């Protein structure tokens, strides 16, 4: 059994213009768990820092118990500090090898008060796209799906889009180890980086 996670690295301003490039998933070896985040920037990073520096946890099942209360607190502070709009949200995904040595995953959504929601086994994507039939190469399959995601999002009104860009990073977790690597770079990465630098 294994778990693979793929993300882009582009973080945008509310208007969709490039802001920074960041790591959107992190691996905590002592918990055998990958944490990934979407939506409002910084929520995942604060949660990972808290788990790593200020909590005693036995594994992902223990994390699922403690996540709601702690994420609600982190979210409330972010709402007050940054005056977040009502339509701004955050989702945190937790994927790992459990205390019972089984693959397990759950998500915590601001739209559901950060309750721990168990994820089913199999593929999961955000935003929506189709799975490439018959593809056996992970890197190639992810590249196909992300290209389709970008195409779908480009067809939507600007204020409804999820922006994807920068580089694609992949994490591959097994019971014994976790590897991460850069899978590919989006064709407009350099242009996005130039735009981001202008905003500083």
Regions found by a protein language model. Name each.
Residues 1-86, 111-200:
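Conserved short S/T/G-enriched processing/targeting/catalytic segments and their helical context
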């Amino acid at each position: 059994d294994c778990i693979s996670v793929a993300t882009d690295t582009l973080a945008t301003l509310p208007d969709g213009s490039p802001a920074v490039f960041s790591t959107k998933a992190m691996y905590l070896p002592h918990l055998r768990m990958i944490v990934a985040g979407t939506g409002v920037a910084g929520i995942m990073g604060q949660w990972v820092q808290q788990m790593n520096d200020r909590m005693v946890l036995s594994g992902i099942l223990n994390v699922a118990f403690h996540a709601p209360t702690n994420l609600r607190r982190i979210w409330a502070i972010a709402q007050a500090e940054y005056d977040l709009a009502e339509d701004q949200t955050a989702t945190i995904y937790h994927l790992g090898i459990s205390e019972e040595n089984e693959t397990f995953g759950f998500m915590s959504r601001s739209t559901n008060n950060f309750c721990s929601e168990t994820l089913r086994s199999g593929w999961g994507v955000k935003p929506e796209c189709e799975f490439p039939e018959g593809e056996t190469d992970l890197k190639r399959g992810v590249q196909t799906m992300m290209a389709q995601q970008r195409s779908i999002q480009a067809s939507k009104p600007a204020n409804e889009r999820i922006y994807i860009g920068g580089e694609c990073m992949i994490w591959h977790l097994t019971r014994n180890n976790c590897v991460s690597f850069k899978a590919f770079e989006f064709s407009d990465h350099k242009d996005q980086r130039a735009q981001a630098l202008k905003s500083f």
